[in-house]
């Protein structure tokens, strides 16, 4: 999205093209600094000459977020950037995976997210459950956001192969204070759930700068009742009818029948995962400018979450009692339910609760001489100080688990899990050369213990602090890197950026325990330490063909090492049972991007061809080359993704003050070679849509009023790998619950600036009430927003 409301004159546009593609472009290539064109941080200092940029950058400013985007979370601010989407299934979703050109909606370790250079990405796993820690940034403190596409900069790790998001937060230059209140809600209708789900958000912040000292203090509170995230469903028992006395007859008037993703009939029995989340963020930043050329800043962020996941059963017996569950482990008559003469089991109607407190510490030291040499140090520590999750195991069919007598269940304690990062970088400006070199260190630590087994659950799912050990998983990974990158202005129209990143990775202290393992399989496994080194070269050549036309070709390799959980944790995931494999090899990505950017009299048009070959891709699949077959996360020999992205920014379209920004992306992603499951060769990589599009139209009616109408589209994609057993994909019915469906969604927002201090806005997301899903979870339906803001 464009950074500015008014489109500059032609000469300025030509200069912008030169900045983006050929000239010294941006400190965005550094983890902690904004682009020179960003209106995101005003410090009053002299800005150093920028580091040339080898990749495409798209950005959105705080002003654009305020006037055109309905969001109360940092993740929501990215939804109109080209080929970019955050899997935010409801407001306050902790599993909001960042999706860009080439990664799926459950591949969280293939993109990288920073806030002021501090890493927010959670590389403990590559899963829907380890999304970036968006909650550490309040949307009101965002000054601007930039996205970088591809592994073309040596300054970032191999996890950046899918892309990089850099959030820059506010740094005050004088006293300022802000207060904002948001209300939002939806009337949600799906199956047997017809209800209103609403919430509120409040934030307050203040900052100041006096004699070189500056500070920022903010608090953010979110309270939201989310809509159901899953719907319990079942199919009829085959074979002999259930024995007399083992079943409960269910009133068929309450039964909801449906067709699943495979085109088969099913019965919807319950709604679950109805999450009431209360999240609080406290952020404190303190900095000091020792001189115009040296600044230090410390950051402390605390995020707390209290979540209650409730359930609702649609089934009633002849007396009107709610029937929650039925299965083999229950006493008669709740081994089955009988509906119109057919017998069914009913499961998954289990409530949950989680309590979390996470701490983030950051330190930035940066020189800013603007001369021949500058340097920067960024250190961060993320600590899951408390992370407890509880799930009930109902003891009979009429017990929801939320009554006066609490049944048993499971408790998972991930407290102490976390990561730390350190980067030290220098920049040398030597005539036609700008040289960046640095060192990097990171360490990730997994601690996860689950108490309560099927036969010996914890005594009280809400109150017990321990119980029979079910599983535990421990392990650490560490990466150390050296990198160098040289930007050489060969001639006024030619810029060559070349670099490389040498990484040494090791995995150690890995172990897990599973009470369910029976002899001869050991219950406790301890894994040998591993180490590996890789080199990733980068090359980019830019050419300013004319004052308004710029070209760039970029080549880059990225190495994405296995996460701690992929190697050392055993867990269940959608569509497959995934087991750990400590011998997994790193993904090796070779990417290309070919860019043409044309400045127009009233804007910009960019076209990008992108290409990615991924070797040893880490994917959950079934290994059919061994007997018995093994379903787990495995290395797949080769994946290929290629596509075209077109983006544009236009100002004063048809009438003064009407700005249009948009993008269209086509991608084709297939499995090229898979020795462990050859039947998958030539089939689609799941969760990569064929088409994506965005369009944002903002009319600045006056200095006080603006109105925005936006559009989001995502096309066909599969929710799982090709099913070689049936010779077809599992989702021929792709737009129902359980699928990763397409969507076509309109949003609108009206902003009114009452005066210099006060403003208010009203908005609607999903104007058409479009129903769409991300296997299996439904996205929000029509959602209304209202906001009131005060700025001092």
Question: Which residue stretches match the model-derived regions?
Answer:
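Extracytoplasmic beta-strand/coil segments of soluble accessory domains associated
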Residues: 75-119
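Transmembrane beta-barrel wall of Gram-negative outer-membrane proteins
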Residues: 195-310, 357-370, 431
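Outer-membrane beta-barrel signature, preferentially recognizing the C-terminal barrel domain
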Residues: 346-360, 368, 470-479, 527-536, ...
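Surface-exposed extracellular loop regions of Gram-negative outer-membrane beta-barrel proteins
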Residues: 445-454, 458-463, 504-519, 529, ...
């Amino acid at each position: 999205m464009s950074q500015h409301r008014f489109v500059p004159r032609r000469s300025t546009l030509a200069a912008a093209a030169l900045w983006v593609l050929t000239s010294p472009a941006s400190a965005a290539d550094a983890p902690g600094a904004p682009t020179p064109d960003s209106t995101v941080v005003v410090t009053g200092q002299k800005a150093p000459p920028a580091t040339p940029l080898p990749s495409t950058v798209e950005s959105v400013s705080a002003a654009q977020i305020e006037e055109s985007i309905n969001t109360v979370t940092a993740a929501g601010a990215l939804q109109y950037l080209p080929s970019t989407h955050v899997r935010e299934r409801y407001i306050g979703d902790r599993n909001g995976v960042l999706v860009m050109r080439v990664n799926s909606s459950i591949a969280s370790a293939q993109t990288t997210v920073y806030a002021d250079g501090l890493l927010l990405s959670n590389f403990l796993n590559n899963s829907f459950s380890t999304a970036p820690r968006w909650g550490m940034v309040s949307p009101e403190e965002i000054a601007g956001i930039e996205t970088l596409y591809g592994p073309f900069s040596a300054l970032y790790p191999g996890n950046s192969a899918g892309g990089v998001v850099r959030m820059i937060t506010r740094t005050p230059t004088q006293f300022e204070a802000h207060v904002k209140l948001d209300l939002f809600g939806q009337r949600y209708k799906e199956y047997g759930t017809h209800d209103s789900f609403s919430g509120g958000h409040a934030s307050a912040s203040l900052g100041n700068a006096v004699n070189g000292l500056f500070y920022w203090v903010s608090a953010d509170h979110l309270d939201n009742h989310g809509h159901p995230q899953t719907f319990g469903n079942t199919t009829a028992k085959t074979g002999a009818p259930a024995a007399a006395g083992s079943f409960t007859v269910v009133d068929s008037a309450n039964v909801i029948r449906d067709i699943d993703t495979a085109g088969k009939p099913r019965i919807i029995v319950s709604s679950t995962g109805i999450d009431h989340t209360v999240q609080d963020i406290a952020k404190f930043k303190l900095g000091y400018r020792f001189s115009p050329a040296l600044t230090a800043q410390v950051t402390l962020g605390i995020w707390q979450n209290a979540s209650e996941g409730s359930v609702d059963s649609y089934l009633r017996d002849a007396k009107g009692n709610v029937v929650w569950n039925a299965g083999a482990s229950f006493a008669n008559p709740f081994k089955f339910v009988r509906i119109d003469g057919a017998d069914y089991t009913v499961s998954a109607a289990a409530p949950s609760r989680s309590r979390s407190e996470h701490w983030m510490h950051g330190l930035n030291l940066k020189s800013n001489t603007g001369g021949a040499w500058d340097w920067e140090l960024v250190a961060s520590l993320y600590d899951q100080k408390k992370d407890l999750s509880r799930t009930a195991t109902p003891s009979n069919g009429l017990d929801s688990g939320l009554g006066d007598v609490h049944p048993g269940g499971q408790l998972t304690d991930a407290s102490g899990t976390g990561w730390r990062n350190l980067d030290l970088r220098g920049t040398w400006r030597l005539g036609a050369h700008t040289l960046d070199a640095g060192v990097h260190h990171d360490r990730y630590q997994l601690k996860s213990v689950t108490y309560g087994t099927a036969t010996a659950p914890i005594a009280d799912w809400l109150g017990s602090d321990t119980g029979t050990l079910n599983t535990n998983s421990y392990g650490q990974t560490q990466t150390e890197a050296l990198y160098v990158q040289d930007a050489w202005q060969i001639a006024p129209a030619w810029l060559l950026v070349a670099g490389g990143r040498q990484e040494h990775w090791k995995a150690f202290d890995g172990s897990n325990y599973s009470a369910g393992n029976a002899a001869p399989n050991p219950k406790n496994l301890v894994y040998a330490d591993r180490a590996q080194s890789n080199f990733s070269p980068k090359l980019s050549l830019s050419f300013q063909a004319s004052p308004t036309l710029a070209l760039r070709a970029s080549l880059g390799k990225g190495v994405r090492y296995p996460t701690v959980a992929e190697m050392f944790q055993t867990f269940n995931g959608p569509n497959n049972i995934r087991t750990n494999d400590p011998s997994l090899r790193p993904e090796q990505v070779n990417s290309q991007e070919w860019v043409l950017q044309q400045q127009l009299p009233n804007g910009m048009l960019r076209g990008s061809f992108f290409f990615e070959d991924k070797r040893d891709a880490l994917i959950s699949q079934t290994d059919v080359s061994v007997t018995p077959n093994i379903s787990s996360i495995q290395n797949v020999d080769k994946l290929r993704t290629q596509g075209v992205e077109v983006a544009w920014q236009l100002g004063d379209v048809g009438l003064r003050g009407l700005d249009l920004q948009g993008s269209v992306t086509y991608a084709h992603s297939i499995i090229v070679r898979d020795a462990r499951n050859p039947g998958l060769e030539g089939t689609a990589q799941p969760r990569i849509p064929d088409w994506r599009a965005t369009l944002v139209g903002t009319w600045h009616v006056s200095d006080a009023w603006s109105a925005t109408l936006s559009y989001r589209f995502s096309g066909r994609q599969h929710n799982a790998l090709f099913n070689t057993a049936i010779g077809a994909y599992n989702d021929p019915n792709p737009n129902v619950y359980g699928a990763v469906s397409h969507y076509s969604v309109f949003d609108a927002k009206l902003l009114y600036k009452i005066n210099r201090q006060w403003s208010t806005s009203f908005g609607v997301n999903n104007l058409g009430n479009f129903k769409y899903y991300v296997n299996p979870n439904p996205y929000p339906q029509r959602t209304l927003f209202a906001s009131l803001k005060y700025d001092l």
